[in-house]
Curated annotation (Swiss-Prot):
Belongs to the argininosuccinate synthase family. Type 2 subfamily. GO terms for biological process: argininosuccinate metabolic process; L-arginine biosynthetic process; urea cycle. The lineage of its organism: Bacteria, Bacillati, Actinomycetota, Actinomycetes, Kitasatosporales. L-aspartate binds at residues 131, 135-136. PROSITE patterns: ARGININOSUCCIN_SYN_1, ARGININOSUCCIN_SYN_2. Its main location: cytoplasm. It catalyses: L-citrulline + L-aspartate + ATP = 2-(N(omega)-L-arginino)succinate + AMP + diphosphate + H(+). One of its GO terms (cellular component) is cytoplasm. CDD domains: ASS. The keyword ATP-binding applies. This is Argininosuccinate synthase. It comes from Streptomyces coelicolor (strain ATCC BAA-471 / A3(2) / M145). L-citrulline binds at residues 99, 135, 139, 192, 201, 203, 280. PANTHER family: ARGININOSUCCINATE SYNTHASE. HAMAP family: Arg_succ_synth_type2.
């Protein structure tokens, strides 16, 4: 049975995620006028686009809200963001710049905590401002039902009566004026902005056109680093981690993780760090474009991954990146609390993050232009003396050891040579006219003639001494692999 209502449930309490903007304000007033009982819930997520979040519930009451609550979600959002940082749960990357999934993080927290707050007031119907074309409608749907299995969903923007009467900003403002309700006649921006303590998303309207660049966006968490008239002095900053968590900035400890993130935002923001322009695949696989800010997360991420690379081996790093990317996509789809996500999170936090302790000092300049000045920690796998070109004592291995290691490589090199000889015989390589077609042929500029027998020559040990021959036979007779 569908959980989504397509008409207003008159006489019932309807919870609305209330931002205080025109859309949600007119929705509350319209629902009250048509006989429903609107109850508003505003999430304090440290949003940088709302300077007076504490006043929002009173605004909701002006429009007819029966209940108007402010729910402090900052601590929970910071904790989920730190988990994402530890796991590298960021799958959207382009040209070396990442989107740090700041909006999906916010939806996981608000979609859960607001519905839990509604339950306390016996509100079993929930609505928000997400549209049917975007990601948020599915994210909120999933998190809402996880928090309250009995939840029903009513979105005014899916109600034909609401859309017919109030289909645009002009109609909404005229409706409020006609009903003697306040309307803040703010200038409509050229794009839409959504923000929380971890970052800001700018999208839609003019930004839907790819010939409109990032420089048309006015940062709300940082500075216009691309503008030469904006003076940005270089700054050195040291980030300290303990078991995968950032704990200090320039040696200073903070009363709460929220305070640390605010300071990271301030430091990264004054250099324009963490701003990226991304084309991404929405949940429904349609492509969209967003311009993102995340100065604090970008700063912490740069320091964290420096330590990760100094501490963990190659296979662990590969798993970290592969599973982190998968976890990022799951979060993007609204599956941050699903079992498969919890499994990946637990693994990465336990086996990758717990070992990450140390400090990284960076020199920040403009945007992503920074240098790493120092990296220290108690348990690095990086040991410069082991690979030094100078004479060292207690070296891990010597020339003879490396000769033996190279000799062991003969087996797989011989196997590769045998395959190349086979491909040459088929006309796949070593010729300008591949027999099976150019689309199936690899680049062959480095490969010349491939006479047979090369593989055997590589794998052969040549003449061996009598002692080595005896050892080989002994190993075979004893069944040793």
């Amino acid at each position: 049975m569908s959980k989504v209502l397509t008409s207003l449930p008159t006489g019932e309490r309807v919870g609305i995620a209330f931002s205080g903007g025109l859309d949600t304000s007119v929705a509350v007033a319209w629902m009250r006028d048509k006989g429903a009982v609107p109850c508003t819930y505003t999430a304090d997520i440290g949003q940088y686009d709302e300077p007076d979040i504490a006043s929002v519930p009173d605004r909701a009451k002006t429009y007819g809200a029966e209940v108007a609550r402010l729910v402090d979600c900052r601590a929970a959002l910071v904790e989920e963001g730190l988990a994402a940082l530890t796991c590298g749960a960021f799958h959207i990357r382009s040209g070396g710049r990442a989107y740090f999934n700041t909006t999906p993080l916010g939806r996981a927290v608000t979609g859960t905590l607001l519905v839990r707050a509604m339950l306390e007031d016996d509100v079993q119907i929930w609505g928000d401002g997400s549209t049917f074309k975007g990601n948020d409608i599915e994210r909120f749907y999933r998190y809402g039902l996880l928090a309250n299995p009995q939840l029903r969903i009513y979105k005014p923007w899916l109600d034909a009566d609401f859309v017919t009467e109030l289909g645009g900003r002009k109609e909404m403002s005229e409706w409020l004026v006609a009903h003697d309700l306040p309307y803040r006649d703010s200038t409509e921006k050229a794009y839409s902005t959504d923000a929380n303590i971890w970052g800001a998303t700018h999208e839609a309207k003019t930004l839907e056109h790819l010939d409109t660049g990032v420089e048309t966006v006015e940062p709300i968490m940082g500075v216009r680093f691309w503008d030469p008239s904006v003076e940005i002095a270089p700054e050195d900053v040291t980030i300290g981690f303990d078991q995968g968590r950032p704990v200090t900035i320039n040696g200073k400890e903070f009363a709460s993780a929220v305070d640390l993130v605010m300071e990271a935002n301030a430091v990264g923001g004054r250099h324009g760090m963490g701003m990226s322009d991304q084309i991404e695949n929405r949940i429904i696989e349609a492509k969209s474009r967003g311009i993102y800010e995340a100065p604090g997360m970008a700063l912490l991420h740069a320091a964290y991954e420096r330590l990760v690379n100094a501490i963990h081996n190659e296979d662990t790093l590969a798993q970290y990146h592969t599973e982190g990317r998968r976890l990022g996509r799951l979060m993007y789809e609204g599956r941050w609390l699903d079992p498969q996500s919890l499994m990946i999170r637990e693994s990465l936090q336990r086996w990758v993050g717990s070992a990450v302790t140390g400090e990284v000092t960076l020199r920040l300049r403009r945007g992503e232009d920074y240098s790493i000045l120092d990296t220290t920690g108690p348990a690095f796998s990086y040991h410069p003396d082991k690979l030094s070109m100078e004479r060292t004592e207690d070296s891990a291995f010597g020339p003879v050891d490396r000769i033996g290691q190279l000799t062991m490589r003969n087996l797989d090199i011989a196997d590769s040579r045998a395959k190349l000889e086979q491909y040459a015989g088929l006309g796949l390589i070593g010729t300008a006219n591949p027999a099976i077609g150019a689309a199936q042929a690899a680049a062959t500029g480095l490969i010349g003639a491939m006479p047979e027998g090369g593989a055997q020559a590589i794998a052969s040990r040549g003449e061996v001494s009598a002692d080595d021959e005896l050892l080989d036979r002994a190993a075979m007779e004893s069944g040793t692999d």
